[in-house]
Design a protein with these regions (language model features):
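Short secondary-structure boundary segments
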Residues: 52, 81, 111, 200-202
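Short, solvent-exposed coil/turn elements at secondary-structure transition points
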Residues: 14, 54, 113-115, 238
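A secondary-structure boundary/capping signal
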Residues: 14, 79-81, 234
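Core alpha/beta nucleotide-donor-binding catalytic domains of modification enzymes
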Residues: 2-72
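Phosphate/ribose-recognition catalytic cores of enzymes acting on nucleotide-derived substrates
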Residues: 154-242
Length: 242
């Protein structure tokens, strides 16, 4: 796009379509809105069109959907070979190709990307994260999988044992949570990056924590970061909980 003097734009939905049809079945997200904006910006995207998926979008006819997209002034569309659009996914790559000729825009259809025998998809990545295979999930994502949050006040048991931890509550998280256990991680604190070890789970060693929690011991770090935002990048699962 930039070689031709055009802007590079990405069209995406800000929520999962199940939010309209099966709100109890909405799968966990793999990225926060802020992470999405940051990653796309780093990839050179000039414009992010992040549209809420609602019933008006779900019911729109394929041709009407393309007509609304024309307001963006695009000259070229790039889609995957399994792309569908419009009500019940009635618009396909074949109908899009016919519309491209009629409306005068260039259409580029890309093959799906695979990691070995597995097609890379959000479903496949969620499965890997749920299994604790953050190494393979990172290979599919092209980055380390990350969780972020505000450091909460815990029971300070880690401090009593000589290794204070930064605690993030996960009960309200809308992101996929890796399988419980101990992970090697990288921690981003106040613009600095540190190594660390993190535990996900209900702390069975102590047995009195009701909600899932992410507890992280940050190597070579000392400081008060209560109520501060941090992000945890998962490198590898070391073991299950004890």
């Amino acid at each position: 796009a930039h070689r031709t003097g055009a802007l590079l734009a990405v069209f995406t939905f800000s929520n999962h379509p199940f939010a309209c049809f099966r709100p109890d079945k909405v799968p966990p997200a793999l990225i926060t809105p802020e992470q999405k904006q940051s990653l796309l910006r780093d990839l050179g995207v000039d414009v992010l069109v992040d549209v809420p998926f609602d019933m008006s979008v779900a019911r729109i006819a394929p041709e009407a959907f393309l007509e609304q997209l024309q307001a963006l002034g695009y000259s070229c569309l790039v889609v995957g070979n399994n792309f569908t659009y419009g009500i019940r996914g009635e618009g396909t790559v074949e109908t899009l190709a016919a519309s491209a000729q009629r409306l005068g825009f260039k259409l580029v259809v890309r093959e799906l990307v695979s990691d070995g025998p597995t097609v890379i998809s959000s479903t496949a990545i969620r499965r890997l994260i749920a299994e604790g295979d953050v190494v393979e999930a990172a290979a599919m994502l092209g980055r380390l999988y990350s969780l972020s949050g505000v450091v909460a006040h815990g029971n300070e048991r880690g401090r009593l044992l000589g290794f204070p931890t930064a605690n993030i509550e996960l009960a309200e998280s809308k992101l996929a949570i890796p399988l419980g256990g101990v992970y090697a991680v990288q921690v981003n604190v106040n613009g600095q990056r540190y190594g660390g070890m993190a535990n996900i789970g209900n702390n069975p060693t102590f047995g009195d924590v009701a909600a899932p929690r992410l507890e992280t011991h940050i190597f070579d770090f000392s400081g008060d970061i209560y109520d501060s935002p941090i992000s945890i990048d998962f490198v590898a699962r070391v073991r299950g909980e004890v």
